[in-house]
Swiss-Prot record:
Ranges facing Cytoplasmic side: 78-85, 149-167, 248-263, 318-344
Topology versus the membrane: Multi-pass membrane protein
Molecular function in Gene Ontology: G protein-coupled receptor activity; olfactory receptor activity
Free-text function comment from the UniProt entry: Odorant receptor.
Gene from which this protein is expressed: OR4A15
Family: Belongs to the G-protein coupled receptor 1 family.
Disulfide bond positions: C125-C217
Major place of residence: membrane
Pfam families: 7tm_4
This protein's name: Olfactory receptor 4A15
Organism: Homo sapiens (Human)
Positions annotated with a glycan in the UniProt record: N36, N290
Domain of life: Eukaryota
Record's keyword terms, sorted: Cell membrane, Disulfide bond, G-protein coupled receptor, Glycoprotein, Membrane, Olfaction, Receptor, Sensory transduction, Transducer, Transmembrane, Transmembrane helix
Extracellular topological intervals: 1-53, 108-128, 187-223, 287-297
């Protein structure tokens, strides 16, 4: 009997081994399905060839204006001793974030407008998602810091020089980047662990949360709620907190001189305009249930293209100190260039 059992085992073992090899475990099957999608197809803003050419020129100009405007602010603030206050330190930081934020998406989107095949690899899509929420998260916190700085400068000017020293400003900026990183990491991990087994078509010009949730081949209800809590709720609470702080600032202007009121009003108006431009699309896109709408593309354009382009214009339009510093700096540069050309 023992001999028969051993013989049967000898015969069946190779067969069982082959079956095990051919039949993947549930875990192996999950990983296979998860890795089915290696790239995503981006539909972009329009499928019309003529419309794509118009958009190519438009967004190329917007991107160039964004880069030049924000770099102009950064260079002017760094080179001008008169712009050494915390407000200008944070403004230069905001311009830097806007520059890298726009650069993370604009070049690919502009190139895709003239490309027949608009695809992005899975890894590239995840990198795009991470950068989107890293820069957006850092900007949200930085706008809060800028509101606090305006509160200190207008409501408690004697304490500002002590409280908002350079070390504190650097720590606040570092906190903004760390906060943006942690927020982005959470959103990234929520998406990265989802299985994507097809389809792979994203109706947008970049990879974002809800279009990706829509493509996941699993129930994403809980994941969607978690993302709302981590993204949309934070945006909404922060937005109304900033508006409330500016309400307090405007109320305190009753005791200011006429010139002080005018200067404070223009400073606050510029910042509130930037806050509204940034937070309204942010709240619309992320503080809602897991769903997508046709207007999402327009809101994403405002968030990633229009706001970074308008920020330099908004902050310099009514800012006499910035305009004066720019004139002095660039007249000096032109004068030096003229002397160099004359002697050469």
């Amino acid at each position: 009997m023992e001999l028969l059992t051993n013989n049967l085992k000898f015969i069946t073992d190779p067969f069982v081994c082959r079956l095990r090899h051919l039949s993947p475990t549930p875990s192996e099957e999950h990983m296979k399905n998860k890795n089915n999608v290696t790239e995503f197809i981006l539909l972009g803003l329009t499928q019309n060839p003529e419309g794509q050419k118009v958009l190519f020129v438009t967004f190329l100009l917007i991107y160039m204006v964004t880069i030049m405007g924000n770099l102009l602010i950064i260079v002017t603030i760094m080179a001008s001793q008169s712009l050494g206050s915390p407000m200008y330190f944070f403004l230069a930081s905001l311009s830097f974030i806007d520059t890298v934020y726009s650069t993370a998406f604009a070049p690919k989107m502009i190139v895709d407008l003239l490309s027949e095949k608009k695809t992005i690899s899975f890894q590239g899509c995840m990198a795009q998602l991470f950068m989107d929420h890293l820069f957006a998260g850092a900007e949200v916190i930085l706008l809060v810091v800028m509101a606090y700085d305006r509160y200190m400068a207008i409501c408690k000017p004697l304490h500002e020089l002590i409280t908002m020293n350079r070390r504190v400003c650097v720590l606040m900026l570092l906190a903004a980047w760390i906060g943006g990183f942690l927020h982005s990491l959470v959103q990234f991990l929520f998406i990265y662990q989802l299985p994507f087994c097809g389809p792979n078509v994203i109706d947008n010009f970049l990879c974002d949360l809800y279009p990706l949730l829509k493509l996941a081949c699993t129930n994403t209800y809980v994941t969607g709620l978690s993302m709302i809590a981590n993204g949309g709720a934070i945006c909404a609470v922060t937005f109304f907190t900033i508006l409330l702080s500016y309400g307090v600032i405007l109320h305190s202007l009753k005791t200011q001189s006429l010139e002080g009121k005018r200067k404070a009003f223009y400073t606050c108006a510029s910042h509130v305009t930037v806050v509204i431009l940034f937070f309204v699309p942010c709240i619309f896109l992320y503080a809602r249930p897991n769903s997508t709408f046709p207007i999402d593309k327009s809101m994403t354009v405002v968030l990633t293209f229009i706001t970074p382009m308008l920020n330099p214009l908004i902050y310099t339009l009514k800012n006499a100190e910035m305009k004066s510093a720019m004139r002095k700096l660039w007249s000096k540069k032109v004068s030096l260039a003229g002397k160099w050309l004359y002697h050469s």
